[in-house]
C-alpha cells in the first residue's frame, strides 16, 4: 500500500461517531450517531426537504424529526441508517472519496460474526474501499494508553464492557458485558429530576439532561456518607440554566444518577456493578497474568469521565482483590476518544500494513475473509 495515502479511521459508537485520518492525534469529525426523519411530511417545506438528516443536522432539527440511533448497545441494528452515517462521514465530514483510502472500523467485543461480515460487505460493495480492517474497540483503547497487556473498562453511550487483553489479543472467555451505560444514566437523571418536579419528555429535552449529566454529575467515594452530607447542607447543590432561561437546582441527583453504575440494583438490574465486572473478568483469566491485569486497569469511553470514578474504582477493587495485589487504575484525560486514537496509531504502523484485507482478497473469498484477517 502506498505510504502517501492516509487510512481513514472510523469509530462507530452507540452515541457518537468519531472519524478522521490515521496518524492524526485526534478525530477530525465527532458527531451524534443519529438519523432523523420528518415526523410529518409537508412540515419541512422550504427546507431542503430531504427524507433524512444525519448527525448534527438531525440534532439541530430534532424538534420536527423522529430521531433513531442505528447502533444500540454497541451493535448495529439498522444497516440502512448505518450506511447513511458512513455516507455522511465520507462525503460531508471528511470530504474524501472512500475508494481512495483504506478504512479501519471498530466494533464492540463479542460482536456477532454476521455483523462483522455485513460491515465488510457494505464497505467493499457500496463504498468500494481498496482495503479494510476491523478492530475491537477496547483493544484500541489499550494501544492508545501505550500498553499491550491490561484490562479495559470501556463504557460509552450504549454498552459497558470489561475486556482483558494479553499481548494485544483479547481473551473472549473472560469478557464481561453490562447493558448499562451513558444513555441509561441520562434516563436515571430524568427520573430523579422528575421527582424534583422538572419534566423532560421529548428527545430534544433529554439532550438537555445529557448536558446536565456531563457538566454536573460525579461519583461519590462513599455513597451513604455523601447522602448524609447532601441532606445536612446545600454545599453540593448546583444551578443549571435551561435553554429557555429557567434555572433549576440539582442536589444529591448529581451523584445518585451515576451510582447506578456501581449498584445496578438501583435500576432493578440483577447484575453487579462495574467494579464487580472488572473483578469477574480478571478471575476468569489465568492466575499467571492476574497481577499484570490488576496493575493495568484502563478506563475508556465517555461514561468513564465522571469526576471521582477512578478513586471509587480503586477503593472497591482494592477491597475485592487479594491482599498482596497492587491495583492501579489508569484514566487517560483523552479517554473519550481513546478508541479512535488507538485506531489512528494502529493503522499508521508499518507492521500493520500487511494486516489489511484487500479488495482483491474480498472478491476472491467473500465477506468471510474478515474472520481470517481481523482476529
UniProtKB/Swiss-Prot annotation:
<dbReference type="GO" id="GO:0016787">
    <property type="term" value="F:hydrolase activity"/>
</dbReference>
<dbReference type="InterPro" id="IPR004001">
    <property type="entry name" value="Actin_CS"/>
</dbReference>
<keyword id="KW-0963">Cytoplasm</keyword>
<dbReference type="GO" id="GO:0005737">
    <property type="term" value="C:cytoplasm"/>
</dbReference>
<dbReference type="GO" id="GO:0005524">
    <property type="term" value="F:ATP binding"/>
</dbReference>
<comment type="similarity">
    <text>Belongs to the actin family.</text>
</comment>
<dbReference type="InterPro" id="IPR004000">
    <property type="entry name" value="Actin"/>
</dbReference>
<comment type="function">
    <text>Actins are highly conserved proteins that are involved in various types of cell motility and are ubiquitously expressed in all eukaryotic cells.</text>
</comment>
<keyword id="KW-0206">Cytoskeleton</keyword>
<keyword id="KW-0547">Nucleotide-binding</keyword>
<dbReference type="GO" id="GO:0005856">
    <property type="term" value="C:cytoskeleton"/>
</dbReference>
<dbReference type="InterPro" id="IPR020902">
    <property type="entry name" value="Actin/actin-like_CS"/>
</dbReference>
<protein>
    <recommendedName>
        <fullName>Actin-2</fullName>
        <ecNumber>3.6.4.-</ecNumber>
    </recommendedName>
</protein>
<dbReference type="Pfam" id="PF00022">
    <property type="entry name" value="Actin"/>
</dbReference>
<dbReference type="InterPro" id="IPR043129">
    <property type="entry name" value="ATPase_NBD"/>
</dbReference>
<keyword id="KW-0067">ATP-binding</keyword>
<keyword id="KW-0378">Hydrolase</keyword>
Amino acid at each position: 500500500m502506498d505510504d502517501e495515502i492516509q487510512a481513514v479511521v472510523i469509530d462507530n459508537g452507540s452515541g457518537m461517531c468519531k472519524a478522521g485520518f490515521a496518524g492524526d492525534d485526534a478525530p477530525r469529525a465527532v458527531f451524534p450517531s443519529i438519523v432523523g426523519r420528518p415526523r410529518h411530511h409537508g412540515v419541512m417545506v422550504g427546507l431542503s426537504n430531504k427524507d433524512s438528516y444525519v448527525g448534527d443536522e438531525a440534532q439541530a432539527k430534532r424538534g420536527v424529526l423522529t430521531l433513531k440511533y442505528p447502533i444500540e448497545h454497541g451493535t448495529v441494528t439498522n444497516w440502512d441508517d448505518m450506511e447513511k452515517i458512513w455516507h455522511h462521514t465520507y462525503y460531508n465530514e471528511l470530504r474524501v472519496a472512500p475508494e481512495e483510502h483504506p478504512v479501519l472500523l471498530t466494533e464492540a467485543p463479542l460482536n456477532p460474526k454476521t455483523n462483522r461480515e455485513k460491515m465488510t460487505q457494505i464497505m467493499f460493495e457500496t463504498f468500494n474501499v481498496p482495503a479494510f480492517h476491523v478492530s475491537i474497540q477496547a483493544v484500541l483503547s489499550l494501544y492508545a494508553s501505550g500498553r499491550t497487556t491490561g484490562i479495559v473498562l470501556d463504557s460509552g453511550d450504549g454498552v459497558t464492557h470489561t475486556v482483558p487483553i494479553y499481548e494485544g489479543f483479547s481473551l473472549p472467555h473472560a469478557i464481561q458485558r453490562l447493558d448499562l451505560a451513558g444513555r441509561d444514566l441520562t434516563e436515571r437523571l430524568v427520573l430523579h429530576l422528575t421527582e424534583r418536579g422538572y419534566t423532560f419528555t421529548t428527545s430534544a429535552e433529554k439532550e438537555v439532561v445529557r448536558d446536565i449529566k456531563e457538566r454536573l454529575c460525579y461519583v461519590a467515594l462513599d455513597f451513604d456518607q455523601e447522602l448524609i452530607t447532601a441532606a445536612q447542607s446545600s454545599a453540593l447543590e448546583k444551578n443549571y440554566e435551561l435553554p429557555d432561561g429557567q434555572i433549576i437546582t440539582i442536589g444529591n441527583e448529581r451523584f445518585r444518577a451515576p451510582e447506578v453504575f456501581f449498584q445496578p440494583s438501583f435500576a432493578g438490574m440483577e447484575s453487579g456493578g462495574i467494579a464487580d465486572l472488572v473483578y469477574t473478568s480478571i478471575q476468569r483469566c489465568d492466575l499467571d497474568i492476574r497481577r499484570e491485569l490488576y496493575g493495568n486497569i484502563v478506563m475508556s469511553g465517555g461514561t468513564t469521565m465522571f469526576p471521582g470514578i477512578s478513586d471509587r474504582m480503586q477503593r472497591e477493587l482494592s477491597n475485592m482483590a487479594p491482599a498482596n495485589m497492587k491495583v492501579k487504575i489508569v484514566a487517560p484525560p483523552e479517554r473519550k476518544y481513546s478508541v479512535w486514537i488507538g485506531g489512528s496509531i494502529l493503522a499508521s504502523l508499518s507492521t500493520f500494513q500487511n494486516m489489511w484485507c484487500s479488495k482483491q482478497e474480498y472478491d476472491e473469498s467473500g465477506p468471510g475473509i474478515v474472520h481470517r484477517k481481523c482476529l
